[in-house]
């Protein structure tokens, strides 16, 4: 039903997840400087810095394509310009396209970007090289085996920050679970 899209670059690199969000961010921020981009929560700090360097803002929200779209609509109604709602899954919706979840529209926007890149001697690959890539990406989902899994999950979320090492930090810019940022001998990252 073409509600999602992914693109393969000239070098064969798959343009999805953070990379797809980065490319679409280049497009919307060039057209709407200072705009906010709503994403779901499992995006990297590298992506946030990439968006900020372009002059935009990222708003991390809970997963679910309808959730990010509704948050973008809400932000616009509150006076915050938000031109793009996108999940790492590839679901993306542009304000100019009535926030429809439309993969074909995403591909069309990227195709329209290509001549501008060529004119500057760039490619999608060179654009993505500007986004720092994580050394490792592992997504783990825990199954809660208790009868009242919701209550157990909420209790774990509440207590988890008490169990982290002192040099790790709770990232408050997160509305889904608990996001912990860490730096040190094992690298920089988040969980």
Label each PLM-derived region with a short phrase:
Residues 1-3, 18, 40, 101-102:
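Acidic side chains
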Residues 1-4, 89-91:
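Short glycine-rich anion-binding loops that position phosphate/pyrophosphate groups of nucleotides
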Residues 18-24, 107:
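Alpha-helical metal-binding/catalytic segments enriched in His/Glu/Asp
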Residues 25-31:
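Short, basic/hydrophobic alpha-helical segments
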